[in-house]
Design a protein with these regions (language model features):
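Active-site-proximal alpha-helix that buttresses catalytic centers in soluble enzyme cores
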Residues: 1-92, 197-200, 204-222, 226
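Short low-complexity stretches enriched in small and charged residues
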Residues: 23-26, 120-129, 168-173, 177-181
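Phosphate-handling substructures
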Residues: 33-34, 39-45, 82-156
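Short glycine-rich phosphate-binding loop at a beta-alpha junction
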Residues: 65-74, 96-102, 178-179
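Conserved glycosyltransferase catalytic-site signature
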Residues: 73, 77, 147, 183
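Active-site-adjacent alpha-helix immediately C-terminal to a catalytic or transition-state-stabilizing loop
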Residues: 149-223
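Acidic, His/Gly-rich catalytic cores of divalent-metal-dependent hydrolytic chemistry
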Residues: 228-237
Length: 237
């Protein structure tokens, strides 16, 4: 599979996905504007560079798009729309393919909001999850957060047999599902599946714009990619 993104490791990972396996790109939205003056991050949209980033990703895609899924937050839906604008016609989704939104790609089980408002704290929450400190994370485990997200990702994906029947006579390549979510969801998955650790502040260990995980397989037997690593999970959670 071909995929060109600002995160070079994802391009290499995509090339390792077998043609006959249905794939999922689960990614953070593209570059957005910075801190809002009113404190409402949900209103922030993509910058011109973020739009170009999404357009460039779309241009590179060489698999038929089957499903479009997103957080209900506008910048995530905007990222999907900007990606599919530039997908080559033979791989573009059909005109009646809607972007399905789900709170599972927006909300977490836990509360990483600021401590002064009763939350755990943003960077603190993910640190406690990674350290398996359930008490400090206010009763939420990394496994619980991960299962919640994985179940949502694989709820509508194809298994290998369905993927084979989905392809038409002129193609032996299985389809691609696009899902746009948030950095917190990407970090949860990377932490659980690849033992990724973040710092207590914003560093390169945090998820970058348009970065995410690639998957193929089924919920009970899937392969995942993250920052140069590849792992297969059987009956996980």
């Amino acid at each position: 599979m071909q995929l060109l993104t600002p995160n070079e490791w994802m391009t290499k990972a995509a090339s390792e996905i077998p043609d006959d396996q249905s794939a999922v790109l689960f990614m953070l939205h593209c570059e957005r504007y910075t801190d809002p003056p009113d404190g409402d991050y949900s209103k922030l949209l993509l910058t011109p560079n973020g739009i170009k980033m999404a357009n460039d990703i779309g241009t590179s895609i060489n698999r038929k798009i089957r499903l479009l899924r997103s957080s209900p937050i506008e910048r995530c839906k905007q990222t999907i729309r900007e990606v599919i604008k530039f997908i080559p016609p033979e791989f573009a989704p059909t005109k009646d393919t809607e972007i399905k939104t789900s709170k599972d790609f927006f909300e977490l089980l836990g509360n990483p909001s600021p401590k002064e408002s009763g939350g755990v704290g943003w960077f603190e929450y993910f640190h406690y999850l990674q350290e398996h400190d359930v008490e400090a994370a206010q009763g939420i485990s990394l496994e619980a957060e991960t299962k919640h997200i994985l179940d949502a990702i694989f709820a509508e994906t194809l298994d290998s047999r369905e993927a084979a029947s989905y392809t038409d006579d002129s193609s032996t390549t299985a389809p691609l599902d696009l899902i746009c979510s948030h950095d917190c969801h990407v970090i949860v998955l990377a932490s659980a599946l690849f033992d990724h650790k973040t710092d207590m502040s914003l560093t390169s260990k945090w998820c970058q714009f348009a970065e995410g995980l690639l998957f193929y397989g089924s919920r009970r037997n899937f392969t995942a990619f993250w920052r140069g690593q590849k792992k297969t999970f059987v009956d996980y959670l």
